């Protein structure tokens, strides 16, 4: 089906184009679309000769749709990262660590992937997670979202959305339900929310879930 050419409602611009030989660019073509929040993308590479903080590096900050895509299309996909690496996307001013003031009373909705899912699901899930964050997809509870992390690990990758207050049940459960739906997870798949305090003090290999959806 042939595209319909838009009508030129400004004959003056056509005359100007003829005289100068240059196309007149509409302001709409270069105006960027602002996001509600400014975001920071971090990269972690596990070098055992360095401290944890020294391994964490700020890549870039952005606050428009166009700058997000410019950054996303410039960096490696999560599935191509070396084992032991992380990407973290957090609101500007919040560092991707439990100790941050905005994180220390919070927790995370955790998605655990098996090895086969790295090829099929990891990049798709992570991009959808980023879309949920920058698009403020959790309605009035988006303010509770701090950021998200993807951990690339040999034994199985993980993706998590971090929230600021694990005791805020309404916000946490709403975020979890929306997130599960956005990822397209089947109803029979259960995802859990863990507080950072429980994760930091766990005695076994698993942390108890505060909430599940």
Swiss-Prot record:
One of its GO terms (molecular function) is translation initiation factor activity. One of its GO terms (biological process) is translational initiation. Transmembrane segments: none annotated. The keyword Transport applies. It is found in: Cytoplasm; Nucleus. Keywords: Cytoplasm, Initiation factor, mRNA transport, Nucleus, Protein biosynthesis, RNA-binding, Translation regulation, Transport. MRNA binds at residues 52-53, 98-99, 153-158, 201-203. It comes from the Eukaryota. GO terms for cellular component: cytoplasm; eukaryotic translation initiation factor 4F complex; nuclear speck; nucleus; P-body; protein-containing complex. Disulfide bonds: none annotated. Residues 1-27 are annotated as: Disordered. eIF4F is a multi-subunit complex, the composition of which varies with external and internal environmental conditions. It is composed of at least eif4a, eif4e and eif4g. eif4e is also known to interact with other partners. tacc3/maskin competes with eif4g for binding to eif4e. Recognizes and binds the 7-methylguanosine (m7G)-containing mRNA cap during an early step in the initiation of protein synthesis and facilitates ribosome binding by inducing the unwinding of the mRNAs secondary structures. In addition to its role in translation initiation, also acts as a regulator of translation and stability in the cytoplasm. Maternal RNA in oocytes remain in a dormant state as tacc3/maskin outcompetes eif4g to bind eif4e, thereby preventing translation. During oocyte maturation this complex dissolves and eif4g binds eif4e to allow translation of maternal RNAs. This is Eukaryotic translation initiation factor 4E. It comes from Xenopus laevis (African clawed frog).
């Amino acid at each position: 089906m042939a595209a319909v050419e838009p009508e030129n409602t400004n004959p003056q611009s056509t005359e100007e184009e003829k005289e100068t030989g240059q196309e007149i660019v509409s302001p709409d073509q270069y105006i960027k679309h602002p996001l509600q929040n400014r975001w920071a993308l971090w990269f972690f590479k596990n070098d055992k000769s360095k401290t944890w903080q020294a391994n964490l590096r700020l890549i870039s900050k952005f606050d428009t749709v166009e700058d997000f895509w410019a950054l996303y299309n410039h960096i490696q996909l999560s599935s191509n990262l070396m084992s032991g690496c992380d990407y973290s996307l957090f609101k500007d001013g919040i560092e991707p660590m439990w100790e941050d003031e905005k994180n220390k009373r919070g927790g995370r909705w955790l998605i655990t992937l098996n090895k086969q899912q790295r090829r099929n699901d990891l990049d798709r899930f992570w991009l959808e997670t980023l879309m949920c964050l920058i698009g403020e997809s959790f309605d009035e509870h988006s303010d509770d979202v701090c950021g998200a992390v993807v951990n690339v690990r040999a034994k199985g990758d993980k993706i998590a959305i971090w929230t600021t207050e694990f005791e805020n049940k309404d916000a946490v459960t709403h975020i979890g339900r929306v997130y599960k739906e956005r990822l397209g997870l089947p109803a029979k798949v259960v995802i859990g929310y863990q507080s950072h305090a429980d994760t930091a003090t766990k005695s076994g290999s698993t942390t108890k879930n505060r909430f599940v959806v």
